[in-house]
């Protein structure tokens, strides 16, 4: 995980608004980040790039070379959302979502962090009981570049008798496991010092190697309490009693599933940020939710996940943890005041649009400074 020196007071950020609600939530995210930067005495130098469907429409490529170069030369990459139903008929390599794979590969990102925190004001938004939900504060650390999505051989093959079979291969090297394990242990060391590694070591040899290497890396972090769960039990425990978890470490496929399951604990995917990190270079920060083309341009989107992704950027790439804290406190303050976008609205709350939610967040930052 890379961090810039805190003495470098101007940070170059690549902003990728993308598709659907992306431009709306990006405007809010940037406004909040600029506000906290002014308060804390540093500056953000924004550069805008094309990605996804917006890039395809203008260039014929969902990830233009100039966008990737811009991202590689920045201190961090701030992404909103890509994708739209109208691109579904395109060949796979031209679809907006393919840009994310290219961006991750081009930036050397292998660790995806999904924080899941339930704000006290939103306990009632979850479909689970309040006593199960209240106080959840966990992070899923998912390996991004290995496992069954990338292993070879892969494909659909036809044998001599004309019978077809589909093949995918789950592969992890020791080096791949070691580097993602270190990211998770470092994170756990700065949190509540509990790490749960999730695998399927009772059946899969690849998981047996995974567990062996995680145990080996654990020796470097004696202060972190390590436990292991099989993926099926982990999925069950995440719903049964999620507060038992601090940091969850797992591979690409299992992480894909568990992170979405964990996302729904909160009751709104519109609240959840994510970070994707590499060994060096800029990190990528984006909300967990998609581009929601059905509500694009209607001022209905919830910008909080975008805003909280900005807080992660401040924390992990720009070495500005106090600024990140301020943003998170502003979100909590606005929720405590009863303001809700349509996805979170309930009787007795005050309904606001995307833009007004952004204005309330900036106002909350100003109130913090005044105090």
Curated annotation (Swiss-Prot):
Cofactor binding note: Binds 1 Mg(2+) or Mn(2+) ion per subunit.
GO molecular function (one): NAD binding
Site, as annotated: Important for catalysis: 149, 200
Gene Ontology CC: cytosol
Pathway participation: Amino-acid biosynthesis; L-leucine biosynthesis; L-leucine from 3-methyl-2-oxobutanoate: step 3/4
Function text: Catalyzes the oxidation of 3-carboxy-2-hydroxy-4-methylpentanoate (3-isopropylmalate) to 3-carboxy-4-methyl-2-oxopentanoate. The product decarboxylates to 4-methyl-2 oxopentanoate.
HAMAP family: LeuB_type1
Family: Belongs to the isocitrate and isopropylmalate dehydrogenases family. LeuB type 1 subfamily.
The protein, known as: 3-isopropylmalate dehydrogenase
Species the sequence originates in: Synechococcus sp. (strain JA-2-3B'a(2-13)) (Cyanobacteria bacterium Yellowstone B-Prime)
Gene name of the record: leuB
């Amino acid at each position: 995980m890379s961090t810039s020196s805190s003495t470098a007071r101007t940070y170059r950020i690549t902003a990728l608004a993308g598709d659907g609600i992306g431009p709306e939530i990006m405007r809010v995210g940037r406004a909040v980040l600029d506000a906290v930067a002014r308060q804390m005495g540093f500056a953000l130098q924004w550069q805008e790039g094309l990605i996804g469907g917006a890039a395809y429409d203008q260039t014929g490529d969902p990830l233009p070379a100039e966008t990737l170069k811009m991202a590689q030369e920045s201190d961090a990459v701030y992404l909103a959302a890509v994708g739209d139903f109208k691109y579904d008929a395109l060949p796979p390599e031209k679809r907006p979502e393919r840009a994310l794979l290219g961006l991750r590969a081009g930036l050397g990102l292998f660790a995806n962090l999904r924080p899941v925190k339930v704000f006290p004001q939103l306990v009632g938004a979850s479909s689970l009981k309040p006593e199960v939900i209240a106080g959840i504060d966990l992070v899923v650390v998912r390996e991004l570049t290995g496992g069954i999505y990338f292993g070879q051989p892969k494909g659909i093959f036809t044998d001599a008798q004309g019978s077809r079979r589909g093949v995918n291969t789950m592969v992890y090297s020791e080096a791949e496991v070691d580097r993602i394990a270190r990211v998770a242990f470092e994170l756990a060391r700065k949190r509540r010092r509990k790490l749960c590694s999730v695998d399927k070591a009772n059946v899969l040899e690849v998981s047996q190697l995974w567990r062996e290497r995680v145990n080996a890396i654990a020796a470097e972090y004696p202060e972190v309490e390590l436990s292991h769960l099989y993926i099926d039990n982990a999925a069950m425990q995440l719903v049964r009693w999620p507060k038992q978890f601090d940091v969850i470490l797992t591979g690409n496929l299992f992480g894909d599933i568990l992170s979405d399951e964990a996302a729904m604990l909160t009751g709104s995917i519109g609240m959840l940020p994510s970070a994707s990190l590499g060994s060096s270079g800029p990190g990528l920060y984006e909300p967990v939710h998609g581009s929601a083309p059905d509500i694009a341009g209607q001022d209905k989107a919830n910008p909080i996940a975008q805003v909280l992704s900005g807080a992660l950027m401040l924390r992990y790439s720009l070495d500005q943890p106090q600024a990140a804290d301020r943003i998170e406190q502003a979100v909590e303050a606005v929720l405590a005041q009863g303001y809700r976008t349509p996805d979170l609205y309930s009787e007795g709350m005050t309904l606001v649009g995307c833009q007004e939610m952004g204005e309330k967040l900036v106002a909350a930052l100003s109130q913090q400074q005044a105090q």
